[in-house]
From Swiss-Prot:
Gene3D superfamilies: Phosphoenolpyruvate-binding domains
GO cellular component annotations of the record: cytoplasm
Family membership: Belongs to the PanB family.
The name this protein goes by in its record: 3-methyl-2-oxobutanoate hydroxymethyltransferase
Active site, UniProt feature: 187 (proton acceptor)
Main enzyme class: transferase
Note accompanying the cofactor annotation: Binds 1 Mg(2+) ion per subunit.
Presence of keyword Magnesium: yes
Biological source species: Bartonella quintana (strain Toulouse) (Rochalimaea quintana)
Domain of life: Bacteria
HAMAP family: PanB
Catalytic activity: 3-methyl-2-oxobutanoate + (6R)-5,10-methylene-5,6,7,8-tetrahydrofolate + H2O = 2-dehydropantoate + (6S)-5,6,7,8-tetrahydrofolate
Length: 275
């Protein structure tokens, strides 16, 4: 008789209940292998539209399609068994109307099995968040530096450097909470504003380039692992995998050229005839 142990996946409601408790741990993930490794240590994994820049080589997140997000979301769901999986709704998939957003968000949930979607924006997107939440789709918000608005911001610029700009970001946060979001990513804002948002909201704030006082933190996994040459100010490198990868590939290439690979132990031989 075999015993099958079912791993209980974290839900959006559980993330919401973590407000003010032990910090919430999160990373981005784009494929099954990295999701499987990160899963035991993360409360949620974000299939971010940053996949367009990190994996596909785009300069911004704007070219990312709904089909791309679903494909990567399916891969992450195969690798992650415990963490809540949240999938970004890409640029152009939700801004037109709440009905458009519901059509695309419901497709994401149905085709991937993920537990929530994430939308960028504040006051202007609150009606859409409300529409989705009332129809059973958990939504994570995203305010501050919103990469899909890179052209409006004139680049990836820190938000809230002048206190005169705080009022709009605070209004965005309040509107998202009132609309029913279970958590909100606070990206690229000055530390005092991130603390203020965390104190004023009853839902968890997930910081990226914000404050250690947020209710949780998220980083792009590849940034944290040490891929790429440009390191944003808010990223701490916990590895140097790009150098290790280059070193391993060079060693492989050298061994192939010198015929040191494959060795006798790494090739198949005929079976010895008996008798």
């Amino acid at each position: 008789m075999s015993i099958h142990q079912t791993i209980k996946r974290i839900t959006a409601a559980e993330i919401r209940s973590r407000k003010g408790q032990e910090p919430i741990v999160s990373l981005t993930a784009y494929q099954a292998y990295s999701a499987r490794i990160a899963d035991p240590y993360c409360d949620f994994l974000l299939v971010g539209d940053s996949v367009g820049m990190v994996v596909h080589g785009f300069e911004t997140t704007l070219p990312v399609s709904l089909d791309m997000m679903i494909l990567h979301g399916q891969a992450v769901m195969r690798g992650a068994k415990k963490a809540l999986v949240v999938i970004d709704m890409p640029f152009g998939s939700y801004e037109e109307s709440p009905e458009q957003a519901f059509s695309n968000a419901s497709r994401i949930l149905a085709e991937t099995g993920c537990g929530a979607v994430k939308l960028e924006g504040g006051v202007y997107i609150a009606e859409t968040i409300d529409f989705l939440c009332k129809r059973g789709i958990p939504v994570m918000g995203h305010i501050g530096l919103t990469p899909q608005a890179v052209n409006r911001f004139g680049g990836f610029k820190t938000q809230g450097r002048n206190e005169s700009n705080w009022q709009q970001i605070e209004a965005d946060a309040a509107a998202i909470e009132e609309a029913g979001a279970f958590a909100v990513v606070v990206e690229g804002v000055v530390e005092p504003l991130a603390v203020r948002l965390t104190e004023m909201l009853s839902i968890p704030t997930i910081g990226i380039g914000a404050s250690s006082q947020c209710d949780g933190q998220i980083l792009v996994m590849e940034d944290m692992l040490g891929y790429g040459t440009w390191v944003p100010k808010f990223v701490r490198r916990y590895g140097a995998l790009e150098q290790e990868m280059e070193k391993a590939i060079k060693s492989y290439a050298d061994d192939v050229k010198s015929r040191a690979f494959p060795s006798e132990a790494e090739i198949y031989k005929l079976k010895q005839k008996s008798g």
